[in-house]
């Protein structure tokens, strides 16, 4: 059987969902997974057991649902058997469970929706094939030698970035920015991260990778950039950095109203919902209303890295 997955972006969400796909793969199913092309380099070799189908992004947002459904048709995937892992698709509310938005965090929701035990989220190591040569090449590019002292930083998320306050680091500790585009695959950074004294990350794909891989070695510092329900459940021992960003965001979804929508018949026309068939703009077809940071990240926590 072929199993399609609807989670075309972002990279952090794809990493969160990989153990879900692996659970179905181990049942003997073929996984067909359309993703936005900018993430393809990270997974095409490291996760070769998935049939990845890279897609171009567009202003209409067709890569959320319309393009994946076309890809499923081409690959003979039954859309009714696909895993729809977005937290919320506002033009297709029948695909989600809005009643659970106030109960589960977004990563818990993906596992609940797919019927996979949440504890498997932290088995990412079993889902990927590391490339030691690529990891060594990256160390060489960065000029890292045995015994070098360094910390890694990742201060960019999908809709958030912060400057690195270098003055708060021990001057003897070199800062290496994981956000620099030095390699096609995020997994090539694993060796560098494992050798670091510390890793300082905003909530991002890099932080998700470190957490889900159970990276041991660096001290871990995590910076929230979203309201509580849109942050992942962390499994490693992180120091959570306080910020003045709001804990709660205005309600994005009215569960009662969405339950009514879901109860209404949603005709499917050639693999598309009625809303799609009507040619509506899908640019707002997102998993949630994007959070816009209203505060700023304090920098005093950086003193924790001083010797």
Where do the language-model regions lie?
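Non-catalytic N-terminal targeting/anchoring module and adjacent flexible stem/linker
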Residues: 246-307
